[in-house]
Design a protein with these regions (language model features):
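Beta-strand-dominated extracellular/periplasmic modules and repeats
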Residues: 11-96, 100, 107-109
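Single conserved hydrophobic/aromatic residue that forms the stacking wall/gate
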Residues: 1-10
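Compositionally biased low-complexity segments at domain edges in trafficked proteins
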Residues: 102-123
Length: 123
């Protein structure tokens, strides 16, 4: 989520893996909000062919102690997979997480299928 240098962008990103297809979930829109106090959108991206963002979602003065929310718009992604319901079970996946030390590495991946999801604090 945070990058202090361009070379760190790949290492410090959220990413999304489609556990139904066994592939990176390319093309999913992801928004990030700060939710410490008033909820405010900070950034938005579309995941690339590797299921990753090409840019840091949080960096510089935006990356500070507080609570954040990632919103993955998975409904549009699953609507485009043949033989799945036209109305997806999951439309948006929201992950709320806290940053207690902005000097540490924060990586929040999403593993998602049409019916379930999981996340963890990655390395």
């Amino acid at each position: 989520l945070y990058s202090s240098a361009a070379s760190d962008v790949y290492k410090r990103q959220t990413h999304c893996l489609d556990t139904f297809s066994g592939k990176p979930a390319k093309g999913i829109k992801v928004d990030i909000y700060t939710v410490s106090g008033k909820k405010e959108k900070i950034n938005s991206t579309i995941l690339n062919n590797n299921g990753r963002s090409d840019k840091a979602l949080l960096e510089g003065s935006n990356f500070k102690e507080g609570e954040y929310e990632l919103v993955f718009f998975v409904g549009d992604y699953f609507r485009n997979i043949p033989n799945l319901p036209k109305i997806p079970f999951l439309n948006e996946v929201t992950i709320r997480f806290g940053v207690s030390n902005p000097k540490e590495h924060y990586h929040v991946p999403l593993l998602v299928s049409p019916w379930s999801y999981s996340t963890y604090r990655g390395s």
